[in-house]
Amino acid sequence: LRAEKDWLLDVDECPKGAKMLYINYPNNPTGATCDKDYLKKVYDWCQENDTILCVDDAYCEMTYDGYQAPSILEIGEDAIEFGSFSKTFNMTGFRLGYAVGHPDLIAGLKKCKGQVDSGAPIFIQKAAIKALEMYGENGEAPEAVRKNMKEYSDRREVLVNGLRELGFDVKMPKGTFYIWFDSKCKTSLEFTERMLDLGIVVTPGSGFGESAEGYVRMTVTQPIPRIKEALQRMKEGLN
């Protein structure tokens, strides 16, 4: 993934003999999003190359400004899509997700999963069922989820606008709760250490690959007053 391509994977650069292609949009760590046309290009490439397509859709409901993340299953059935209760329902510690897709792919996944652990505890599964039952007949997200997304959206605007005022070139993400930007330092680690000195934790982009060197990831998982405090510390501590 590269900045000049808006952090979208270029399938034309992927090896033709790939057995599996795994993509994640809305994307961690970049916050990048894609449309149906992009997904169709990826889907068609996988069909042409007999490549299994796996789509990590954990952030599909963490979207803003009218953007709706498309599902790969809107394009075709020969794929598998993974979802998570961690982000949408703030159930991070429960470690529960789900998969939907072509029956043959699901069958293969079940064989692998059955050898990894003994499954999620029943009480967690029941909590997830209750969460899904909160959705309306038309698929509308429950009020609790909409409220959470509004809060994340507001925090996102505060952090992005604050970083811009400090001189950073930051895109307003339409998905996830991550803010991704060029630190203007030679290395991500250099900026990360400077931020630690200010009492602020960020994630260095170098941990995500060579093309992410120099970038850092921040999150909007803290309330707005804390975000503003972090911005003030940056204003006073960075030059």
Predicted regions, residues:
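PLP-dependent class I/II
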Residues: 1-239
